[in-house]
Amino acid sequence: FDRHGGEEEGKRLPELDPGETVRRAVGVERTLGGVVYAACSVASPGVVEVSSRTSKLILGELDGERSARAVSLAEAFKAGGLPCSVSPDIRSEVWGKLLNNLANGPLCLLTRRNIRDTFADPVLHGAALKAVEEGLATAAAMGRRVSSSAQERIALSAKIPHKPSILQDLELGR
């Protein structure tokens, strides 16, 4: 929770960076937040296929500053053909992506079906909504406002015949 502010400032999650190896190697001052929205699969070692037509990358400074480095990096990605924006609240963007993962990953893993087929089941669709609602409440408790409702978030992915990476990993024995 570096550059987070409030009572969470400086708290660590050792499970995410055991021994703070990445933190020491990269440093907080050189860290940019980022969120990727893309339906991808590993075709072979070192080869990733992107199947979504609406892929995008969102970057942002941890403290919300609109820095020259974030803008410059976003422009470089755009020049390379990847839609990219700079967010004034990257932490809320991360929460938004996490909400998608909360709904899609576990349910698709349990059913071993893609998102579209999983969410076509009314019971599973309802479970996904509940997971996102719980995530929204947790984000709000952490002071983060996610821009769309649970229904809107589920509707965005409900028609996608994509298998989340956690299901792809299971199917490949990883």
Predicted regions: what is each one?
Residues 1-44:
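Rossmann-like NAD(P)(H) cofactor-binding subdomain of soluble oxidoreductases
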Residues 3-12, 20, 46-74, 125:
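Short beta-strand and adjoining strand-loop segment in the mid-core
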Residues 17, 72, 134:
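Short Gly/charged-rich anion-binding patches and loops
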Residues 29-30, 55, 73, 82, ...:
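A generic secondary-structure signal marking the coil-to-beta-strand transition
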Residues 35-40, 63, 90-94, 102:
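Glycine-rich beta-alpha junction loops
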Residues 62-66, 70, 75-82, 86-92:
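ATP/pyrophosphate-binding catalytic subdomain of soluble kinases
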Residues 83-174:
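Helical "substrate-binding/catalytic lid" subdomain
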